[in-house]
Amino acid sequence: MQKTATTPSKILDLTAAAFLLVAFLTGIAGALQTPTLSIFLADELKARPIMVGFFFTGSAIMGILVSQFLARHSDKQGDRKLLILLCCLFGVLACTLFAWNRNYFILLSTGVLLSSFASTANPQMFALAREHADRTGRETVMFSTFLRAQISLAWVIGPPLAYELAMGFSFKVMYLTAAIAFVVCGLIVWLFLPSIQRNIPVVTQPVEILPSTHRKRDTRLLFVVCSMMWAANNLYMINMPLFIIDELHLTDKLTGEMIGIAAGLEIPMMLIAGYYMKRIGKRLLMLIAIVSGMCFYASVLMATTPAVELELQILNAIFLGILCGIGMLYFQDLMPEKIGSATTLYANTSRVGWIIAGSVDGIMVEIWSYHALFWLAIGMLGIAMICLLFIKDI
């Protein structure tokens, strides 16, 4: 009798552990590829800077189209588990193609298409985790927050490992390592993640349901808010290394230390935000994130020493920790009947942020300076703050 009573708990714990591993492995697969992609294109494919920029923009646009198509399909019919498994398979194919092919146009077409399907595994995993948590009575906020923390942990480990594999061995070894991550991820999905059929109503935890027109308006506004926040962050990520080296004349090692510290601090900030979300609300937390981001970008402009630049990463961690942890939950609660679309919509705000940042970056630097980009980032956060004030807190 004792054995029977403990079995469900063990099954639930095993399933939760599987979700955490899938989140980490999909994060590692992405963290291995993204940081070195521009170097791969320039060194291995001999792509010119404009071709590198076009590759990133094309990847973002294709990712938005593919992920939104799959999200609508998954919310209406089908099993998310099967979809995640297929996305992992596409990830293996994409990494294998990048490992051996050196034709720019093949990678831009076939490679980007396969990678776009592969990247959808992550938002679909979060959607399945939310549905599973609702069905089993788990605390959805902290469960989703812990899952998102695995992505951040992957980005602490992934980039240094990517550079070590690519520069110490070869890009082929790096991409095959990412392919192995997708294979292991697919096995875990197949063996341990639950199947939840779309035609069975999901019993969700209590969420305040707004009238349809209000929810659509708030969802659009939240999309603008998160897109502006990601655009500001991406402007910083693109230009911070050059600003540190060319403007402040500090070492390139400092840029890696800044990214590593921010990623490490982001995890506890994310968990703290998840813990206090029900007490102070999502909107106030997002407002705190925006204010922290504004203070961070303004302070970076005034800082001149490595110690201060490193200390300021606490503000960056607050900004990113709340955006990554609470932003997705905000979308899901605004669209409770379309969890897949909500999660994918949040993921696409990051892609839109890359498109915006990449489009204005080169022009701003040519006309003005790196300083102007930080002020532009602050202005983007100002737009995000105004839009946020018109969104109902739920």
UniProtKB/Swiss-Prot annotation:
Gene3D superfamilies: MFS general substrate transporter like domains. Keywords: Cell inner membrane, Cell membrane, Membrane, Sugar transport, Transmembrane, Transmembrane helix, Transport. One of its GO terms (molecular function) is carbohydrate:proton symporter activity. Residues 1-10, 71-80, 126-150, 194-224, 275-283, 332-370 are periplasmic. It comes from the Bacteria. InterPro entries: MFS, MFS_dom, MFS_trans_sf, Sugar_efflux. GO terms for cellular component: plasma membrane. It is found in: Cell inner membrane. The chain crosses the membrane at residues 11-31, 50-70, 81-101, 105-125, 151-171, 173-193, 225-245, 254-274, 284-304, 311-331, 371-391. GO terms for biological process: cellular response to glucose-phosphate stress; D-glucose transmembrane transport; lactose transport. Involved in the efflux of sugars. The physiological role may be the detoxification of non-metabolizable sugar analogs. Belongs to the major facilitator superfamily. Set transporter family. This is Sugar efflux transporter C.
